[in-house]
């Protein structure tokens, strides 16, 4: 899988960019939120990427930030939401706005995004509830820093929701290494 590309920006044709990485040109689809923040053609850039393989195409999607890529990955797991719609959602609202809309169960905000209907918005709210807050910086998530943030990410990646992960973090000692903290948190969650 291609996780990151760094190279010279050759072309900007919304929502696609052409990136030259050591003589190889990569066409990368980017959400408009990232597109507007790109430097001028000829400048060096780095994009975090998601590689999607379909029967008829191999596509690269690029993101300026890790939370943006995490949101994209979460969105494409939802039934009826493909990469194109996920890109549209991330182009229509910031990652923080998306996390906030999901945390507050605001379908009306999601319906404003082109291509997202009432049913899709309700499905997004249902399937992403409790999964995006800490990943994407929603204000309802637990405030953590340093090793605790890494432990929280690990717990969320293992499928625990925000509430469970936050409860496990409270059981940890103040100064703990990430690997030990994950073990402690998992023990706390299994009690």
UniProtKB/Swiss-Prot annotation:
* Entry keyword set: Cytoplasm, DNA damage, DNA recombination, DNA repair, DNA-binding
Region span, Domain I: 1-64
Q: Where is this region: Domain II?
A: 65-140
Q: Please indicate if the UniProt record lists Cytoplasm as a keyword.
A: yes
Job description of the protein: The RuvA-RuvB-RuvC complex processes Holliday junction (HJ) DNA during genetic recombination and DNA repair, while the RuvA-RuvB complex plays an important role in the rescue of blocked DNA replication forks via replication fork reversal (RFR). RuvA specifically binds to HJ cruciform DNA, conferring on it an open structure. The RuvB hexamer acts as an ATP-dependent pump, pulling dsDNA into and through the RuvAB complex. HJ branch migration allows RuvC to scan DNA until it finds its consensus sequence, where it cleaves and resolves the cruciform DNA.
Complex and partners: Homotetramer. Forms an RuvA(8)-RuvB(12)-Holliday junction (HJ) complex. HJ DNA is sandwiched between 2 RuvA tetramers; dsDNA enters through RuvA and exits via RuvB. An RuvB hexamer assembles on each DNA strand where it exits the tetramer. Each RuvB hexamer is contacted by two RuvA subunits (via domain III) on 2 adjacent RuvB subunits; this complex drives branch migration. In the full resolvosome a probable DNA-RuvA(4)-RuvB(12)-RuvC(2) complex forms which resolves the HJ.
UniProt protein name: Holliday junction branch migration complex subunit RuvA
Organism from which the protein derives:
Verminephrobacter eiseniae (strain EF01-2)
């Amino acid at each position: 899988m291609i996780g990151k590309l760094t190279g010279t920006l050759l072309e900007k044709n919304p929502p696609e960019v052409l990136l030259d990485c050591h003589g190889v040109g990569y066409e990368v689809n980017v959400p408009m939120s990232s597109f507007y923040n790109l430097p001028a053609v000829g400048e060096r850039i780095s994009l975090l990427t998601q590689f999607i393989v379909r029967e008829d195409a191999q596509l690269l999607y690029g993101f300026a930030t890790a939370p943006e890529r995490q949101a994209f990955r979460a969105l494409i797991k939802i039934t009826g939401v493909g990469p194109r719609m996920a890109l549209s959602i991330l182009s229509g609202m910031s990652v923080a706005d998306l996390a906030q809309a999901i945390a507050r169960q605001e379908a009306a905000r999601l319906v404003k995004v082109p291509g997202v209907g009432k049913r899709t918005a309700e499905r997004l709210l249902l399937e992403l509830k409790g999964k995006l807050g800490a990943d994407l910086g929603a204000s309802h998530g637990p405030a953590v820093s340093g090793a605790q943030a890494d432990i929280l990410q690990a717990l969320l990646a293992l499928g625990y929701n925000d509430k469970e992960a936050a409860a496990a973090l409270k059981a940890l000692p103040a100064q703990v290494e990430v690997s030990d903290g994950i073990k402690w948190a998992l023990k706390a969650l299994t009690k």
